[in-house]
Design a protein with these regions (language model features):
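A conserved beta-turn-beta hairpin within the catalytic core of GNAT-like acetyltransferases
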Residues: 52-56, 109
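Unchanged
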Residues: 65-89, 97-154
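Acidic, metal-coordinating catalytic segment for phosphate/diphosphate chemistry
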Residues: 2-35, 39
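Entry beta-strands of beta-propeller and related beta-repeat scaffolds
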Residues: 42-43
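Charged phosphate-binding loop/patch that engages nucleotide di/tri-phosphates or the phosphate backbone
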Residues: 153-172
Length: 172
């Protein structure tokens, strides 16, 4: 790392260094996620029990892009794979984020896009989540209100999800 004050050199932040290291090693992962709201404005989250370092956390349905797949197609495919629902339309992209995370036992730079979608069915059920997703680490799923997201002490990704949803809906 460069010393401060040397002309033409910039000290890298920890995130910048990790990002550069992941990119140099070809460990870039593209991903798409869906913020799915029910008629009552609750958001669907899946709980993953990954063990260290990610631990137990809640996140929106989604995952990595397949080769030659675009973000929107990946978002819809992942939603269908994780819920069994293929009748959901995306309303639009609401956020992009970059993060360093462990995936498949290695450090990766993940670039993901988050899409907003709605279902018109209240309390829509996911069938067979235990059998279908145990191998993927999905331990549970539930619909959360924004107030529950604000109050929870559990880990929810992305951080600030309730505010992201409020902003997307113009309720900020």
């Amino acid at each position: 790392m460069a010393r401060a004050g040397r002309p033409g050199r910039v000290a890298l932040s920890c995130f910048s260094w990790l990002k550069a290291a992941a990119a140099r090693r070809g460990r870039l992962r593209l991903a798409a996620r869906v913020i799915l709201l029910d008629p009552d404005g609750r958001v669907l989250l899946m709980r993953y029990d990954d063990g260290p370092p990610n631990g137990s956390h809640w996140t929106t349905p989604g995952g990595g892009l397949n080769e030659a797949e675009d973000y929107r197609a990946a978002a819809l495919r992942e939603l269908a794979e994780e819920t069994g629902w293929s009748d959901i339309a995306l309303l639009g992209e609401v956020a992009r984020r970059r993060l360093i995370m462990e995936y498949g036992g290695r450090l990766v730079l993940q670039r993901e896009r988050l899409y907003l979608a709605r279902t018109d069915q209240a309390c829509r059920e996911i069938r067979g989540v235990d059998a279908m997703h145990a191998a993927d680490g999905i331990a549970a799923w539930r619909w959360w209100t924004l107030a529950e997201l604000d109050a929870t002490r559990e880990t929810v990704w992305p951080a600030g999800l309730a505010d992201l949803i409020r902003n997307a809906l113009g309720q900020a």
